[in-house]
Amino acid sequence: MQPTDPNKFTEKAWEAIAKTPEIAKQHRQQQIETEHLLSALLEQNGLATSIFNKAGASIPRVNDQVNSFIAQQPKLSNPSESIYLGRSLDKLLDNAEIAKSKYGDDYISIEHLMAAYGQDDRLGKNLYREIGLTENKLAEIIKQIRGTQKVTDQNPEGKYESLEKYGRDLTELAREGKLDPVIGRDEEVRRTIQILSRRTKNNPVLIGEPGVGKTAIAEGLAQRIINHDVPESLRDRKLISLDMGALIAGAKYRGEFEERLKAVLKEVTDSQGQIILFIDEIHTVVGAGATQGAMDAGNLLKPMLARGALRCIGATTLDEYRKYIEKDAALERRFQEVLVDEPNVLDTISILRGLKERYEVHHGVKIADSALVAAAMLSNRYISDRFLPDKAIDLVDEAAAKLKMEITSKPEELDEVDRKILQLEMERLSLQRENDSASKERLEKLEKELADFKEEQSKLNGQWQSEKTVIDQIRTVKETIDQVNLEIQQAQRDYDYNKAAELQYGKLTDLQRQVEALETQLAEQQTSGKSLLREEVLESDIAEIISKWTGIPISKLVESEKEKLLHLEDELHSRVIGQDEAVTAVAEAIQRSRAGLSDPNRPTASFIFLGPTGVGKTELAKALAKNLFDTEEALVRIDMSEYMEKHAVSRLMGAPPGYVGYEEGGQLTEAIRRRPYSVILFDEIEKAHGDVFNVMLQILDDGRLTDAQGHVVDFKNTIIIMTSNLGSQYILDVAGDDSRYEEMRSRVMDVMRENFRPEFLNRVDETIIFHGLQKSELRSIVQIQIQSLATRLEEQKLTLKLTDKALDFLAAVGYDPVYGARPLKRAVQKYLETAIAKGILRGDYKPGETIVVDETDERLSFTSLRGDLVIV
């Protein structure tokens, strides 16, 4: 048969035949024979390779034999362009056509060519005999691969073993111990089994937030199936996870995707209920593969799902379920919902304890139980935009990976010694070129120093290598223990209790003794001298990782917060002068909240600061951010004068759908999503439009706010401060007169009630009145301002000193009871900063000098000192 008509062959078969002339040319041969075709089939890495694999043959070995056979054939010294079809290949193609008729197919496919090789006297017969591939065995393998399929089109190979190509057998992975253990989730697994056991609509869909463990439930079911911990209806079933990406990828022609999916579904239905399909991200089937009139995957699934012919478990997030599945009511009714909630912190700790061994073996480190508890608690507290247990597992994984990296990298002490040796070696080279006695003396000293460092290097290197070796040995033994545990489980499943007992009480016990001995050896090495390597993940490692993720400084997480909170009042007093009552009220409210006595579903604290301008309202908010969250950047400042119009209110939460800027999110909500631990300052709230307070009610009462895109933003870890100038005139009237304080307070509160609704005022924790500043208090504020200026001058290597008279002068000229401390800042700029700036520009002050500022004749005088020497 002359292979001139590609329409008689399948695409893959013709592709291999078309490649044979090229292979013959490469080997300078003029006739195309069966060996060239077999070489082309093996190169495809398709059905031919699969047949050889199932026959138990080694593909590289078969390849070598074919190539060796080709190399032995006669070669032409100068081959002509014309290439002929050899007699053996002609006969092979005739036999392939006979095989095609025998199987009742429409096209010659690769399996027909493989069957024809069994009668090929040139190469095929001998090769098959060598690998033990008889005619019956080949027929069995072809039947196993094809199932009940017939070759009715030119691309049948894409439909063979579809589940193997486009799916992962979870039960097989569970049997091999490649799935992580699933802890808890019994209720959800039980409900899934219950739905799978129904007669019709036996399709559960697992719905939950990303990272709560939906896929883990499917894996847990696979583990239960292999442990026979399921009802009779699910005993010995296969759970196969379908990869929608692989199913769609490479489907070039119209209808090819549908063909692949139909082949998968046919394989599942042909199994008579033996296969359960798991589709992760099930929303991807809606609309998948739909192009101009083509059916999408969801519509292909519907008939089978309804009549119970296909048992399918789906998994998707709440948002995607609503967006894709709920829109298609016909698809939705075929699935039964199983809601997967986020586990609480205690359940997460149990999950982490169950996974601990897996991560220890993988990374070759130990993980302390305190680290697991810290991972669950800190991730729950500090990472609000992700869900447990996923975020806690990620923390443990990353902390263990970091420690593993440190073990394999050179220790810091050794690195320092290496650098020092390199530096001394370079110094020695330059000294060897010198001939004077001082250089020779220095060289002698350097040689001794170098010898000492090299000795230390050798000692440290030896210690590092020995510690590293023991840690590696522990890891290897633990991996073996893991493997033995798998073998024990397999033996128990096979009811081979003799083997299980032999492994458990023989091999496993020996390995556990080995681990104990190695751990003791490592402990001795580490206690005998200074340990170079650490092989246990601790609480501090978890805190360090979370600090990198969230930007909250590590000391904030590890340092005893009690200590910090006890000293909060003193810290605030040192920065905010003359507002003792306000500082005490703020500190006490935060202490109550952090001690766990305030409502956990509301913000940490909320205050209204009332008082005239320049008395320290905003300064106290900044000081609070700095002391609680270690940076003033944790202060989210929103100027309410920007929200005077009704339409501007939407800027807080983001523009509604359909408006410009919808994708950008809100100014307030985005800031808190990025940094959930913040002090929020709403400056001058009396200027805001009334609708702003409707938004505030929700934040103050529930500690949450939903932005325009539907994200719920958590305000439970924020401190909310609102400032206002309302009633300032009454506060200034009684400045310094404590006897009239209550009268003033009631008048100020009357003004507040006139301007704000009672439901708003009622939700605020405390309304704090800031007093007008007294002249005596301004001196302390001057010192704070001077300290700030002195710090800036230090960068230019200048020191600043002010006499008491100079301080009193600045306090006097900067005092204005109406404007508070702001005129003081202007006075420091006018009388002090300007004069020093001019002096620096004129060159009066040189680096290293001290600028002494005094007051003479109601003006400041400046003197420059170098040491005790006065420079005029």
Curated annotation (Swiss-Prot):
Keyword terms: ATP-binding, Chaperone, Coiled coil, Cytoplasm, Nucleotide-binding, Repeat, Stress response
Database matches in Gene3D superfamilies: 1.10.8.60, Clp, N-terminal domain, P-loop containing nucleotide triphosphate hydrolases
Domain Clp R intervals: 6-148
GO cellular component: cytoplasm
SUPFAM superfamilies: Double Clp-N motif, P-loop containing nucleoside triphosphate hydrolases
UniProt-annotated stretches for the region Linker: 343-551
Subcellular localization: Cytoplasm
InterPro entries named in the record: AAA+_ATPase, ATPase_AAA_core, Chaperonin_ClpB, Clp_ATPase_C, Clp_N_dom_sf, Clp_R_dom, ClpA/B, ClpA/B_CS1
GO molecular function per UniProt: ATP binding; ATP hydrolysis activity
Sites where the protein binds ATP 1: G208, E209, P210, G211, V212, G213, K214, T215
Region described as Repeat 1: spans on this chain: 9-73
Region feature (NBD1): 161-342
Pfam families linked to this entry: AAA, AAA_2, AAA_lid_9, Clp_N, ClpB_D2-small
UniProt domain comment: The Clp repeat (R) domain probably functions as a substrate-discriminating domain, recruiting aggregated proteins to the ClpB hexamer and/or stabilizing bound proteins. The NBD2 domain is responsible for oligomerization, whereas the NBD1 domain stabilizes the hexamer probably in an ATP-dependent manner. The movement of the coiled-coil domain is essential for ClpB ability to rescue proteins from an aggregated state, probably by pulling apart large aggregated proteins, which are bound between the coiled-coils motifs of adjacent ClpB subunits in the functional hexamer.
Subunit structure: Homohexamer. The oligomerization is ATP-dependent.
Name of the protein described by the UniProt record: Chaperone protein ClpB 2
Organism: Synechocystis sp. (strain ATCC 27184 / PCC 6803 / Kazusa)
Gene name of the encoded protein: clpB2
